[in-house]
């Protein structure tokens, strides 16, 4: 289900006008500049991001045919209630492929983001519920081997790195291998790079999907964890 799209459009690559618009909105973040460059935004940033999202959605749907995935492309407009001195427009655009659950920020989600000076993609949680991360640590305590196997494989690759906020105090005794994972409040497996020639390449979706394939074992691990928490909460009601 492509929430944000109607007709399928193939990604042809971003272009220099994409980059120019992103820098422009960063330094000219006001309505008059945006209105003058709205067509540039729609043609050179929004349209290719949607096309990229559609191809990532199709690829992930093929890998995870039983998951109720949807595609979401972000709005460039900031929430007027939360400007906090910032301009009315974001200087970046992101998309995510996720399940349709209402509390999706607490579930594993695949994403791509582009900004004036970087692009990133990966999979992770942004606002994992404390109860979910508590269950995560309980599962590691009870049987660390499944995650250890995944982490050893993860540590051999060069594309993604583990990111996310950590607890200041130790949450328990765990092996050196798993300690960085055990201490996370939420986590993301992220690839971030300065803008380079890859973003202009029509093969970018295929390259990202091949990288996402390497994250599928983590996606399944955390999806199973979410399901276990749902069952546990259902019993408690």
Where are these regions (language model features)?
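Long, solvent-exposed, polar/charged low-complexity segments
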Residues: 4-24, 53, 145, 153, ...
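Inter-helical turn/loop segments and adjacent helix faces that build the functional surface
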Residues: 29-36, 130-134, 201-202
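Aromatic- and glycine-enriched beta-alpha-beta binding-site module
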Residues: 81-141
């Amino acid at each position: 289900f492509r929430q944000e799209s109607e007709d399928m459009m193939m990604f042809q690559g971003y272009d220099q006008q994409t980059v120019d618009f992103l820098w422009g909105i960063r330094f000219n973040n006001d309505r008059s500049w945006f209105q003058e460059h709205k067509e540039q935004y729609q043609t050179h940033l929004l349209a290719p991001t949607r096309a990229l999202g559609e191809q990532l959605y199709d690829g992930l749907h093929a890998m995870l045919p039983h998951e109720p995935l949807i595609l979401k492309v972000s709005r460039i407009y900031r929430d007027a209630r939360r400007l906090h001195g910032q301009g009315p427009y974001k200087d970046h655009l992101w998309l995510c492929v996720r399940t349709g659950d209402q509390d999706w920020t607490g579930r594993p989600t695949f994403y791509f983001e582009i900004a004036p000076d970087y692009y990133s993609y990966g999979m992770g949680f942004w606002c994992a519920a404390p109860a979910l991360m508590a269950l995560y640590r309980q599962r590691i305590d009870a049987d660390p081997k499944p995650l250890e196997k995944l982490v050893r494989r993860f540590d051999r690759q060069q594309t993604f790195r583990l990111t996310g906020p950590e607890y200041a105090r130790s949450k328990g005794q765990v092996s050196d291998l798993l300690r960085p994972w055990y201490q996370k409040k939420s986590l993301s497996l992220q690839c971030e790079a300065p803008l380079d020639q890859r973003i202009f390449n029509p093969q970018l979706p295929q390259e990202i999907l091949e990288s996402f394939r390497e994250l599928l074992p983590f996606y399944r691990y955390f999806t199973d964890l979410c399901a276990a928490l749902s069952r546990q909460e259902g019993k408690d009601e």
